Design a protein with these regions (language model features):
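Conserved active-site motif detector
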Residues: 188, 192-213, 229-232, 237
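Conserved non-catalytic scaffold segment of RNase H-like nuclease domains
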Residues: 45-62
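Short, acidic loop-to-helix structural element flanking the phosphoryl-transfer center
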Residues: 59-86, 94-97
Length: 259
């Protein structure tokens, strides 16, 4: 499959670093949870709005940026399986060269000269899957979308679009891609609901599926073997990992607070 990856907040923790740099420059402290929409400048103080875009040209800000956990190892496995990997970004032209160098250092097994795409209209690219943190880049595309969960896309009802699936970290990306591959192969674009699972566990024919509650995705369910399922449910800022022991009994394996 042909898989395209957004860069900021999909590969790297860019917004977290922007907020850290903004705090260092101004003393105004904001967290990811404060950013309820895609454009950060809408959430800073009025005194900082006009010049906020200049923060993206500061070397000290970009020095803070780190690759998200498990990203490189998952991309490497996807590449080794024969998938074509592309990076697609709306980076300003003057920053493209720096981003290309960063990507080449981070993903030495790829030739960035052949796989970096810059565009403000991602719907124009012809790929099988786009991974992005901005839901508007996924809507109305010819591709399946994987939405990386953040506060600024929390209000997007991904269950309303049968080609967009939400994940919460890179460990969920690879099995979600496998699930989408299953959908493509079977020409089925319908998510399986928790009710479907309860009525007929055999409907699970891939390693991961979305878990829906009242038509809203609250997590994912993974089949381990012999019909045994594990799952992760997101409730607010709590992530609950569970293992099904029987039809009516679940074991809570871990409860994590998402920051």
């Amino acid at each position: 499959m042909v898989i395209a990856l957004d860069c900021d907040n999909v590969i790297t923790n860019t917004t977290a670093c922007v907020l850290a740099q903004h705090y260092a420059d101004t003393g105004e402290k904001l967290t990811l949870d404060d950013i309820k929409g895609y454009y950060i400048e809408n959430y800073v103080g009025d005194d900082y709005k006009d010049d906020f875009h200049l923060i993206f040209f500061k070397k000290e800000m970009w020095k803070r940026v780190q690759v998200l956990p498990h990203c490189v190892e998952v991309v490497k496995r996807l590449h080794d399986k024969g998938n074509e990997i592309y990076f697609v970004t709306s980076t300003e032209p003057q920053n493209v060269a720096k981003k290309a160098r960063f990507l080449q250092r981070t993903f030495p097994f790829l030739d960035i000269r052949k796989c970096l795409i810059t565009t403000h209209c991602k719907q124009m690219i012809g790929v099988d899957i786009l991974i992005d943190d901005y839901e508007m880049n996924l809507i109305n595309g010819s591709y399946f979308g994987i939405l990386m969960d953040y506060p600024w896309n929390a209000n997007f009802d991904d269950a309303s679009d049968d080609k967009i699936y939400r994940v919460f970290d890179w460990l969920q990306v690879e099995p979600m891609i496998e699930y989408i591959q299953t959908l493509k192969n079977s020409n089925e674009n319908k998510a399986i609901t928790s009710g479907d699972i309860a009525k007929n566990p055999s409907v699970i024919n891939s390693s991961i599926i979305p878990l829906l509650l009242d038509d809203k995705q609250i997590g994912v369910v993974r089949q381990i073997e012999n019909g045994v399922m594990s799952g992760e449910i997101s409730l607010g800022n709590l992530s609950i990992e569970m293992l099904q022991l029987s039809d009516s009994k679940y074991e809570v394996k871990a409860i994590r607070i998402k920051h």
